[in-house]
Amino acid sequence: MSEKKYKWHKVADSLGEVEFAVNNIAVVDLDGKKICLGKFNDALFAFAFKCPHAGGMLAEGFIDALGNIVCPLHRYKYSMANGRNVSGEGYYLKHWPVEIKEEGVFVGIEEMGGLFGWLK
């Protein structure tokens, strides 16, 4: 299996520019779409703005003591590391890698390649 390739999108000039709420979640713009950034310990994660279960705004949720994103509507929990639902319902939260560079904060969106690469 080949290594994933990402196109990196700048979401902030610096980490200090990102306005994290008390719950350690911030909403940022990624090419005209809202996504969330979450901080847990020393790690930074990017994930979808809405819960895949019922569309709850995850920025209004919280990060639990284990580093899971908790939806404010029905308390569904998702791993920030891999997007998997950890409360057993089988939903999957879109998530993306984050890199902090001298030029700013970047979120990586996987590039499509191989058989379906022509669909870009």
What do these predicted ranges mean?
Residues 51, 71-74:
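Short cysteine clusters
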